[in-house]
């Protein structure tokens, strides 16, 4: 038996009970979007996957796809797209966007900390005082010692041990 190409959506709120046809191209675009959503879900870590509202069969299909290679993975992505067609994908997409945005925010914060570290080493006490006014919980003596040692390492071209330690200290104190 042949499948119908277009899927009518009946809008019962209209007075004239008009049937709205969805084109085959639109159905294909929606399916392709859901497959891409499924592929993005597969790339998530298990911790991030738990933050997304998925039912058990969808979680199971995603976990299986994470262990597959190449062609089996492609088929599993198609299957996940099929499972997503029967569900409301808006909350899943919203949760995925939040998870991805959190990663971008963490990357931006790390970049900011690297800039602060470079300022501390290049400008010395002036930038240290400014940093301590913004973040009074930091240990002035420890930071000053790390900065002094990093400046010495830079002058004599030693490996940048304290340079990295400043960043680690800032990350441990400022990133919650």
UniProtKB/Swiss-Prot annotation:
GO biological process terms on file: assembly of large subunit precursor of preribosome
Organism per entry: Haemophilus ducreyi (strain 35000HP / ATCC 700724)
GO CC annotations, alphabetized: cytosol
GO terms for MF: ribosome binding; rRNA binding
Keywords from the named record: Cytoplasm, Ribosome biogenesis, RNA-binding, rRNA-binding
Keyword hit for DNA-binding: no
Main location (coarse class): cytoplasm
NCBIfam families: PRK05255.1-1 (NF003593)
Similarity comment: Belongs to the DarP family.
Job description of the protein: Member of a network of 50S ribosomal subunit biogenesis factors which assembles along the 30S-50S interface, preventing incorrect 23S rRNA structures from forming. Promotes peptidyl transferase center (PTC) maturation.
Official protein name in the record: Dual-action ribosomal maturation protein DarP
Source taxon at top rank: Bacteria
Cell compartments where the protein resides: Cytoplasm
